[in-house]
Amino acid sequence: MNLKPENLAEIRRDFHRFPELGFQEKRTKEKIAGYLKELGLDVHYGVGIVGVLRAGKCNKVIGLRADMDALPIHETNTHDYISKNTGVMHACGHDGHMAMLLGAAHKLSTNANFCGTVVFIFQPNEELGLGAKAMMDEGLLENFLIQEIYGIHNLPGVPTGELLTRSGIICSSESLFEIKIKGIGGHSSMPQLGRDAITIGAEVVQALQTIVSRRIASGSGAVVSVTEFISNGQRNVLPGETILKGDVRTRRPDDRKKIELYLNQIASGIASAHNIEIDVFFETEFLETINHIKPTSAVLETAKKSGLKITDCKPMSFSEDFAHFSNAVPGCFFLLGNGTDGTNSQPLHSSDYDFNDALLPIGSDFWASLA
């Protein structure tokens, strides 16, 4: 299939039929590379795919990024292009992000009304927060001399094509924690002879709920959630160990550092009270995504010229590894409404979500105008 504006929907649906998980995007990368070569772009292979388009003698270099990976979700949609890879699905719209960026590459390569260099970045493994860093480790920004970078994401429940962005924090960071409680197991009829790791675990869970509201302001956007409570007990056996796992979101690096400190303080205090050991593991996977003033102004100005409705949104609670790029060079991450009806309005990461094909020409034209 040739890459033409009228074919973008079918190209998007082809990506949808054959979704691939992070760092496994083999077919996806081959398809993208083929389309970019068809347009005459310089194509570079690595953990992702990069296409380079030059026009005129200007030194300006901008990067436009789309993510490629799918999610380990079993699709429940009934349309004729549902996933053929069982248990894997494009439930976050990355199929549409790729198609929009390919559409922009077509428009700019056939009508090069810009001066400078556009670097089309197709990134793997956004969902686990590993792809952007992997491309940076390969030298993406230095090798292509990228001066500004832009990222896009669809947002269900918002009218089709409505643009949302803001200067400053746009997406929260995400950190994961694991708390290992080393109690003393024993018989359920004689709990006083052991150190009940379940009761102690419950105490830790309760204490963690006081971090936001009692240590960090409830309006800060910080969230601490315990998502797993794991023990090896039986009906008449008190477990000797309990593991708690959870998720932390913050909009400020200082809050993230404070929460890590408070997690350790709570664990240490409860461990001391019960004369046991508690180990805490804390790792940040996604940094806070920060939009810089100049590129954000460029996005807003382009939106006005394109006739798009603009919403100055609040920071989002979800996370994006685009943060690795925008922490290194000036950048802007923005969202386009995916629609308010049917599967287009279903939440991201749900089994009945679908990207809105009506957004493809809007996003493609916007990318091209931004360049």
Give the residues covered by each predicted segment:
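Residues that form or flank phosphate/diphosphate-binding pockets in enzymes
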Residues: 23, 59, 99, 130-131, ...
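Conserved beta-strand termini and adjacent loop/short-helix elements that scaffold enzyme active sites
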Residues: 44-48, 123, 281-283, 313
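Divalent metal-coordination and catalytic microenvironments
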Residues: 15, 64, 94, 120, ...
